[in-house]
Regions:
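Hydrophobic ligand-binding cavity/cleft-lining segments
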Residues: 1-36
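Residues at helix-coil transition
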Residues: 11-12, 132, 136
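Glycine-rich portal/gate segments that line the openings of hydrophobic small-molecule binding cavities
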Residues: 17, 27-76, 90-93, 126-134
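Beta-strand/loop substructures that line and gate deep hydrophobic ligand-binding cavities in soluble
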Residues: 68-122
């Protein structure tokens, strides 16, 4: 699949439910039909069994190669997620880069390597498998 087609998949915020692990019980509460710069998304999920509401804004939108979302409200002190797509041999490579800070530092920093980091790795591994299956 070319970068344009893959980017179109990400431009539909409702596809997030299909690529998010079921154990998070992710549900979109409010979102536009198509993402663009300035779009707001409200959703709920469960982190470590606790109900969380999260609000995200799309702050950069550069079809078909990049977009960035930031958390406006949610569990992190800071969350910035850069999604990059690059045309590759017969398809598209997708890269995710996340910058985050936890609340309750420095205590949270002690737990981060064994909790949050592993949890995020599991989420992104699941997403990669789902994206590959859905966009094949």
């Amino acid at each position: 699949m070319c970068a344009e087609e893959a980017f179109a998949f990400f431009a539909d915020p409702w596809n997030l439910e299909a690529i998010t692990p079921p154990w998070l019980r992710f549900r979109i509460l409010e979102a536009p039909r198509t993402l663009e710069r300035g779009s707001l998304l409200d959703y709920s999920l469960r982190l470590f069994g606790l109900p969380i509401r999260w609000r995200t804004e799309i702050v950069e939108w550069r079809p078909p190669f990049e977009f960035i979302d930031v958390q406006l409200a949610g569990p992190y002190r800071r969350w910035e997620h850069n999604h990059r797509l690059r045309s590759a041999d017969g398809g598209t490579e997708i890269f995710d880069h996340v910058l985050y800070r936890l609340p309750y530092e420095p205590v949270a920093a002690l737990l981060e390597p064994v909790t949050v980091r592993r949890w995020l790795e599991a989420i992104f591994d699941y997403r990669a498998g789902q994206i590959e299956a859905l966009l094949a």
